[in-house]
Amino acid sequence: MAKLYYDNDADLGRLAGKTVAIIGYGSQGHAHALNLKDSGVQVVVGLHEGSKSKAKAEAAGLQVLSVGEATKAADVVMVLVPDTTQAQLYSDEIAPNLKPNATLMFAHGFNIRYGQIVPPAGVDVSLIAPKSPGHRVREVFEHGGGVPGLVAVYQDASGEALQNALAYGKGIGCARAGVLETTFAEETETDLFGEQAILCGGVSALVKAGFETLVEAGYQPEVAYFECMHELKLIVDLFYQGGLSYMRYSVSDTAEWGDYIAGPRVVTSETKAAMKLLLEEIQNGAFAEDWIEENHTGRARFNKYRSTDVGHQIEQVGRELRSMMPFVNPKEINPGS
């Protein structure tokens, strides 16, 4: 049975008199820094020279230092820059300045799990991973709540790494909702699998295939977009609120019957076998090795995949239709960003 911790299991006093360095001030970074600050914790933000986030952090009343200076000043260092830049940043700025008995923290275990960061033996290494985007972590906290999170300990030099990590989890509000104990390996492997097989890879491929099937059969692209992309949110919201059963309760009997008889024909035993292969590649490090190499060699395939999908018909049709629906809060991105 999973072990869950709540506010009464965590002691925020463990962070009293200590300085927490938040390295990075993006989606998660700003939420962690501001929530900790509001919880009475001494926070500094570590950013690279010329960072556009410096003005935002200072406007929020936070002290901004270089990554090296922030690390040197801190008892707890939370690394919240992208996975792809962590290893180099750790080597150049964090490792040389890390206090001998500091706590090194992450919100995702990729670089620890795959050996891109190897911490010194004398420091605690732990993880607090909110299960929500940063803006939501902040928003819910400001309304007196919290989002669920994961906690893990990779290295317990002090003998108190778990308790200290839970204090951090309480400081950002996760312990209000519940913090589930896991491991760096489990968090990393399941997170990557979810992204690849379901949340990003699986859903994107399914939506495109459905759209293409309808358009190739002669149906209007606009109607195909509504059926295969736009209405997906309506169903996912039902999943989010009450799982599969609530979704089926909420849709028509015709839709529910179609769910039962058609779903297994689309997601077949071959699909599940492919999922198992993806998981094996995550577990044995093949995916990580490929992704690390892709970043070291200029991201040629990554950029090609990105530019190809930007030109997909479903994207063109979607932009036009979303412009007619201001209530969905339409977003546009620069394809090169």
Swiss-Prot record:
This is Ketol-acid reductoisomerase (NADP(+)). PANTHER family: KETOL-ACID REDUCTOISOMERASE, MITOCHONDRIAL. It comes from Herpetosiphon aurantiacus (strain ATCC 23779 / DSM 785 / 114-95). The lineage of its organism: Bacteria, Bacillati, Chloroflexota, Chloroflexia, Herpetosiphonales. Mg(2+) 2 binds at D191, E227, E231. One of its GO terms (molecular function) is magnesium ion binding. Pathway: Amino-acid biosynthesis; L-isoleucine biosynthesis; L-isoleucine from 2-oxobutanoate: step 2/4; Amino-acid biosynthesis; L-valine biosynthesis; L-valine from pyruvate: step 2/4. The active site is at H108. Its cofactor is Mg(2+). Substrate binds at S252. It comes from the Bacteria. Residues 183-328 form the KARI C-terminal knotted domain. Belongs to the ketol-acid reductoisomerase family. Binds 2 magnesium ions per subunit.
